[in-house]
Amino acid sequence: MEISVASVTVSVAVVVVSWWVWRTLQRVWLKPKMLESYLRRQGLAGTPYTPLVGDLKRNFSMLAEARSKPINLTDDITPRIVPYPLQMLKTHGRTFFTWFGPIPTITIMDPEQIKEVFNKVYDFQKAHTFPLGRLIAAGLVSYDGDKWTKHRRIINPAFHLEKIKNMVPAFHQSCSEIVGEWDKLVTDKQSSCEVDIWPWLVSMTADVISRTAFGSSYKEGQRIFELQAELAQLIIQAFRKAIIPGYRYFPTKGNRRMKAAAREIKFILRGIVNKRLRAREAGEAPSDDLLGILLESNLGQTKGNGMSTEELMEECKLFYFAGQETTTVLLVWTMVLLSQHQDWQARAREEVKQVFGDKEPDAEGLNQLKVMTMILYEVLRLYPPVVQLTRAIHKEMQLGDLTLPGGVQISLPILLIQRDRELWGNDAGEFKPDRFKDGLSKATKNQVSFFPFAWGPRICIGQNFALLEAKMAMTLILRKFSFELSPSYVHAPYTVLTTHPQFGAPLILHKL
């Protein structure tokens, strides 16, 4: 009997180990080689597959080298931010494949193909190759199919233009407080002062999203912002280990800290959401902030079609991260570029004077700022917050004249596209807001070559929010100060999920 039990145990163990070996072999060798063969038969050029790691090691090595030294203000930023994709583009042409571990990733530069990917949201879905990213922000941005449709329907009312216009006073309050602090610094230094604007802008946009999303101040939401910033750094570090199967489950110090930070964020958000729900049940009038509008929209859904408390919390996480991060990045590069291009700074200031005079900025006036809009679009073109988007294919698909197998990813290289000379002309790398003077369609020649907020059905729901907030901030800043780059400024854009200034952004502010 003992022999029989032992034999069965050994047999089961052999089967389990054999199954695991077979699955591993299939994942790290057989399937990648099959997909590589398929893509090459389509005429696609790309890198040869390296078992398990793919191109990650080469990519990280080039990125580390690029980040090790700053660049000149007039240099192209793409070799510093996306060195490996740029090299592959030069080597293999405008459609090529590389490897994210064992997953082939096809980079496309054709606007018609990009348009097709954006439009077919049920066929080209969000890639989930790095689950740790969901710790910092999941929600609407990470969903597909019917779940995405449901969440988009519920969240949409919170971002209607009329609702966003009602948030302009909150924009004004948060921006005025920071401008007031800068004014004190400059006054103390007798009309001119060096200020690293980066941490101030981080604080300002955090305060804006705290007020407009949750009706609170930055101090109340400060812990969430601190935890999300810490998570962003930890996730970037963990990304280098992403190729190791099951790495996120290893009890490393970094993994334990990520999970602890994520738990703390959920605990804080659960308290915020539950407090609102209790107030609603007690008969209090709903708040007119993003969370209040979201809860009202959710309660208005038929039974079974609303969001759970957990799902509401995920959307709140996304509000906090995307609502703060995107506008901070847009504002810092706007001020850096206007410091370089004093003529455009003067034009923007003159427009602000013409539209508002001495009046307090309002939504109607902000929407009349044509020069400001041109400047912001050009900044978004040259320094997009997110440098690429990725989509996944789960079944054989036709994309233009390509037939692509299930199991591959599509990379939409925002930065490379928006600085591409074939699409934007020989001056693609230059700061020329005039290219947008007749609107987006004319500037892009009706092609999908400008998509800092994505494009099509999945275009960023907070686009108008970010642009209106940026216009308010720049209006108040331009009224109060002129500014130029400090001699201590070091030009070193790099990515920490979004495009940050690696060594801050010290400017010289002059009081007007």
Swiss-Prot record:
The gene is CYP72A13. Its main location: membrane. The chain crosses the membrane at residues 2-22. The keyword Mitochondrion does not apply. Disulfide bonds: none annotated. One of its GO terms (molecular function) is monooxygenase activity. Keywords: Heme, Iron, Membrane, Metal-binding, Monooxygenase, Oxidoreductase, Transmembrane, Transmembrane helix. Induction: By cis-jasmone. It is an enzyme of class 1 (oxidoreductase). The keyword Iron applies. It comes from the Eukaryota. One of its GO terms (cellular component) is membrane. This is Cytochrome P450 72A13. PANTHER family: CYTOCHROME P450 72A11-RELATED (PTHR24282:SF255), CYTOCHROME P450 FAMILY MEMBER (PTHR24282). InterPro entries: Cyt_P450, Cyt_P450_E_grp-I, Cyt_P450_sf, Cytochrome_P450_Monooxygen. Its cofactor is heme. Its EC number is 1.14.-.-. It comes from Arabidopsis thaliana (Mouse-ear cress). Heme binds at C460. It is a single-pass membrane protein. It is found in: Membrane. Belongs to the cytochrome P450 family. Pfam families: p450.
